[in-house]
Amino acid sequence: MSIKLAVPCLLLLAGPAAAADPLPDAIAALGESVVLSVHAEGAQVYECKAGTEGKLAWAFREPIATLLSDGKTIGRHYAGPNWEHADGSAVVGKAVGNAPGALAADIPWLKLEVTAHRGNGVLTSVATVQRINTNGGKLDGVCDKAGEFRSVPYSADYVFLKKG
């Protein structure tokens, strides 16, 4: 085999491995397989509350998002956090790991352990949810009136995984 042929072959072999960035360890779900991956468009809702030192600060309240697959609405995401599929299946999660978003304005990537299931359908076997590829969602600015609410647009991808 000539060098002219060997170099492109090596580049082809190395290409996909180099292009695929692994998830941060804090949100990886080793040994689990993907059940469903969806895109979400929505808002992170914040409330102005007194913080630990008595000063007013924005506190995360809840997400409100539409879950999309191939441009079609297939579910929703809301406080709990809950993810509800159009087939009636739903899961509730609890954050167990996080990693920073790409930009300062991006909410963090999360790993959530499923703590409850409802209904039967595509989400029935889900054990873990990952929130990745976040864009936006963090609130910046002054908070000066307790009880005030603000919504910050965000998008993310949610990956639903099962054991094995």
Give the residues covered by each predicted segment.
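Hydrophobic h-region of N-terminal signal peptides that target proteins for export
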Residues: 11-19
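Primary mode marks residue(s) on the alpha4-beta5-alpha5 output face of response regulator receiver
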Residues: 20-45, 52-164
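Bacterial N-terminal signal peptides that target proteins for export
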Residues: 1-7
